[in-house]
Amino acid sequence: MNTRPRRALRDTRLVIFDCDGVLVDTERIGPAIVAEMATEVGWPLTPAQVRRRFLGRPESYLYEQVRAHATVPLGPGWLGVYRNRVRDAFAARPHTMPGVRELLDYLDLRQLPYCVASSGSHERIEHSLTATGLIERFTGKVFSADDVSRGKPAPDLFLHAARSLGCPPAHCLVVEDSPAGVDAALAAGMPAVGYSGGPTEPGVLSHATLGVIPDLTHLMVTAGG
C-alpha cells in the first residue's frame, strides 16, 4: 500500500472532503441527468462524456457550456430544473459511498477536524448530506462554490474552507474524485488523495500528490500506521 498518505497525515490538521462521489453516491446520477437535459436542447452527450467534461466543475461552468452548445435557448430556470431532477433522483435512493461512516468515526476518535468543500450549491450539498444522515456531522463545516468567485480547478474554494476553519493549507488533506478537484488542491498548496471508489478512473487522478485509493477506509489504515 502507498505509504505517502501515512506520512502526510501525521501533520494533517483538517481533512477536506469533496461531496459528490466521495461522501455521497451521486456521481452515477448527475451525469445521466446532464446528458439527458443537454440532449434535449440539442447537444447530444453521453454520461461518460459528461463525466469527462464536468466532473468536479461548478454548476455555473456546466450551465455556460450547455448554453454555448445548445441549439435552442436555455430558459432561466434550466439550472434549477437540473438541481430538482438530481435531488429527486437521489432522494429515491440516497447512499453514502462505502466506508464514509467508518472513516468519519475514525477521524472523530482521533479528534481530527473535517469539512466538505464541493462544487455543488449549498442547497444541493445540504440536501445530499441530510438524505444520507450526515448533515449533523458537518454542521458549520459546509463550503460551496457559491461562496467564492472561482470554482474548481481554481484553489479559491479550498483556501476559503481552510481559512474559515483556521488551518494552514499545508496542513490540510483533500480527498477528491475529480481531476479538477485535485488540480484545485495542488493550486492551493494542499496535499491531495485521489478517490477512485466511484465511477472515476484511477488514471485521471494520478497527479494527486498522495496517490489514489479505491476505498476510503484505506485512509484509516494509513493514518494508523
Question: Where do the PLM segments sit?
Answer:
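Conserved phosphate-coupling serine/threonine residues in phosphotransfer and NTP-handling enzymes
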Residues: 22, 118-120
